[in-house]
Amino acid sequence: MARVTVEDCLDKVDNRFLLVMLASKRVKQLYKGARPLIDNRGANKNVVISLREIAAGKVGYELTSRRSR
């Protein structure tokens, strides 16, 4: 995959807003020192790495129910 697009990631995440949240959380983990879950031989930025991980199905999410007020 030479270029990552939102459409590549939306195959794994149904909602683009959820995709933004998932990618941003993964970027924070990478900045804090987490190892990439994909091969990163190039000098890719953490945002690109996180999107590639999501598109490859290496990063997922679980929705929890909201608390009632």
From Swiss-Prot:
Record-listed E.C. numbers: 2.7.7.6
Keywords for this protein: DNA-directed RNA polymerase, Nucleotidyltransferase, Transcription, Transferase
Catalysed reactions, as listed in the record: RNA(n) + a ribonucleoside 5'-triphosphate = RNA(n+1) + diphosphate
One GO term of the biological process aspect: DNA-templated transcription initiation
GO cellular component: cytosolic DNA-directed RNA polymerase complex
Family the entry assigns: Belongs to the RNA polymerase subunit omega family.
Subunit-structure text: The RNAP catalytic core consists of 2 alpha, 1 beta, 1 beta' and 1 omega subunit. When a sigma factor is associated with the core the holoenzyme is formed, which can initiate transcription.
Protein name: DNA-directed RNA polymerase subunit omega
